[in-house]
Swiss-Prot record:
Pfam families: Ribosomal_S2. It comes from the Bacteria. Belongs to the universal ribosomal protein uS2 family. Residues 228-248 have a biased composition (Basic and acidic residues). This is Small ribosomal subunit protein uS2. Keywords: Ribonucleoprotein, Ribosomal protein.
Length: 254
């Protein structure tokens, strides 16, 4: 079980919040003080709260749930796509399409269209069209891939959302809350922590800080998946043992 240490947080600037004039007073309990007009986040709390969030992620995946990583700001896009992909989880990095969760049936139609276009290019069907039409289809596929590529294999809603900058991702937060999907979020000093189920007080702007948290949550997903597989193997062994017991009893009776 790998948690993020305070040393790692200090090295990546997790403790630097926003300018004091841009704060949300609800974040007061998580602020250590201010320096040169910048709020300093209390990392002792961040360390503890990250552990709670980490364990929630592990437990969710261990029980067969899926996590959606959400981070559309420029600093987060690469890390979110890379780490969510490594962990085999869903992600959104380009822009949040309204209704991605609350109107998933409609979004699914766009996903089906994306898969159809990918199949056409993969098997050469697209070559039946004229060059101009092929270029149009390529642009359509690229646009859909940029928006939906991270959720194209999502056949049901995620059981947990992990968000970088809930202030920016306000529409995604509203959809999760409406559907009762628990939210883990890296929450800077300008955010409303009341909207988040598992708050991780921290810098949501610095690339190194973002990478630290995103990689750690991806590791938590992988840890949960390993536990799920281990339990599944144990259950299979137990079933096999139960199935063999009657046969052993019959053999003994003979």
């Amino acid at each position: 079980m790998a948690y993020v240490s305070m040393k790692q947080m200090l090295e990546t600037g997790v403790h630097f919040g926003h300018q004091t004039r841009r704060w949300n007073p609800k974040m007061r309990p998580f602020i250590f003080g201010a320096r040169n007009g910048i709020h300093i986040i209390d990392l002792q709390q961040t360390v503890k709260m990250f552990r709670v969030a980490h364990d929630k992620v592990v437990d969710t995946v261990a029980n067969g749930g899926r996590v959606m990583f959400i981070g559309t700001k420029r600093q987060a896009q690469e890390a979110v796509a890379t780490e969510a992909g490594r962990a085999g989880q869903f992600y959104v990095t380009n822009r949040w399409m309204g209704g991605t969760l609350t109107n998933f049936f409609t979004i699914q139609k766009s996903i089906d269209r994306l898969k159809k276009l990918e199949a056409m290019f993969a098997d050469g069907t697209v070559n039946r069209y004229q060059k101009k039409e092929i270029l149009r289809l390529q642009r359509e596929m690229d646009k859909l891939l940029a928006t939906l590529g991270g959720i194209k294999d999502m056949d049901k809603l995620p059981q947990l959302a992990f968000v970088i900058d809930p202030h920016r991702e306000d529409i995604a937060i509203k959809e999760c809350r409406k559907l009762g999907i628990p939210i883990v979020a890296v929450t800077d000093t300008n955010c409303d922590p009341d909207l988040i189920d598992f708050v991780i007080p921290g810098n949501d702007d610095a690339i190194r800080a973002i990478k630290l948290f995103v990689a750690a949550i991806a590791d938590a997903c992988l840890e949960g998946d390993a536990l799920r597989k281990e339990r599944k193997g144990q259950d299979a062994e137990e079933e096999l043992k139960k199935a063999s017991e009657p046969k052993a009893a019959e053999a003994a009776a003979e």
